[in-house]
A protein has these predicted regions:
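Hydrophobic beta-strand positions
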Residues: 25, 64, 95, 111-112
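Beta-strand residues that line the small-molecule/cofactor-binding core
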Residues: 74, 102-104, 120
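PAS/LOV sensory domain surfaces, especially short acidic/polar patches at coil-to-helix junctions
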Residues: 29, 33, 37-41, 47
């Protein structure tokens, strides 16, 4: 039987479903809980195809990747550190986009904190070119 999701995650998912900017929702343990249609278009797979993924699964498949094209482990990602400290984070990353091509992105991470403490994070991202400008 599935445990009830925190209300703040349910509301965050509803918000992400209604915005045109690529975004995903990460749960308290780093699992990929949801990503919207715009994110699915960028990575080449709809959320309905992947479903919920563990932190290890989604970082291996989608990234972020380092300069040698190796996945950055979830716990070594600076955005993860910030969220665990209930701080927002913004940075540039490389992900695996549609067709297996790597794409540079800018990403902003916002922690979600409810009555019971941290529930996860919202990550909003967009493609950027080599100069860091939106692509």
């Amino acid at each position: 039987m599935n445990a009830q999701k925190p209300l703040e995650l349910i509301l965050a998912r509803n918000l992400l479903s209604s915005i045109p900017t690529p975004a995903f929702l990460v749960g308290e343990k780093g699992e990929l809980v949801f990503y919207n249609e715009a994110a699915g278009a960028l990575v080449g797979r709809r959320f309905e195809e992947t479903g919920k993924l563990s932190a290890e699964e989604w970082t291996t498949e989608f990234g972020p990747f380092d300069e040698n094209e190796q996945p950055i482990p979830y716990l070594q990602n600076p955005a993860t550190t910030a969220v665990r400290e209930n701080r927002p984070y913004h940075g540039n990353f490389r992900i695996c986009a549609a067709g297996g091509n790597h794409q540079d992105i800018a990403a902003s991470t916002i922690p979600i904190v409810g009555p019971g403490g941290s529930s996860g994070a919202i990550v909003i991202f967009w493609a950027v070119n080599e100069g860091g400008k939106p692509a």
